[in-house]
């Protein structure tokens, strides 16, 4: 029971570390990809990792990893720290917190497991109209075409943002991981209907975005 209480307290502290960042007057959070707000989320994540005695790695597209190893064959537990506009506080953050908790357990129990906790940049499409940018670029599976022309809500191109930050749109492919695990909040009603708290996802619906232009003619009667 004592260990369980400590785990809950640590989980609450992790959550509070991120809680106010990007808060809005409507009660949600706005943490757009490759914004200063998302930067702050990643800096907090780095600090929490260093508290565990872990090393911090930032890759060529700005993704952040907290790691206890420099060896190949590691387990990667990851998610994202950005959000949609007026998003929820658990989306993405819960998966990163879960990884930090696993790393803490391994350290406290003396379990030697090569582990990395990852936070991928710009998972949501709210800023550029295009999702999974950080993870998509490093896997070489999502973006076969150039995406540097994408424009942020502030009117700045992704290419310009990357250049300013010293990042590249053509990074090396991620390597060395043995398995990947992501805990995520449910964004549906399956668990509730099944009256269970946890499920294992078998398939994922791929996101598709459309931009629609409507040309209208206005007719009025006298």
Regions found by a protein language model. Give the residues of each.
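Conserved small/polar residues in nucleotide/adenosyl-binding loops
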Residues: 219-222
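Catalytic-core environment of secreted peptidases
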Residues: 48, 52, 60, 64-91, ...
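General structural feature for long, well-ordered alpha-helical segments within catalytic domains
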Residues: 7-14, 37, 41-48, 102, ...
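N-terminal capping segment at the start of a domain
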Residues: 2-35, 121
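A non-catalytic alpha/beta surface segment that caps or lines the substrate-entry region
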Residues: 23-69
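Short beta-strand elements
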Residues: 199-216
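Acidic/histidine-rich catalytic neighborhood of metal-dependent amide-processing enzymes
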Residues: 84, 94-198
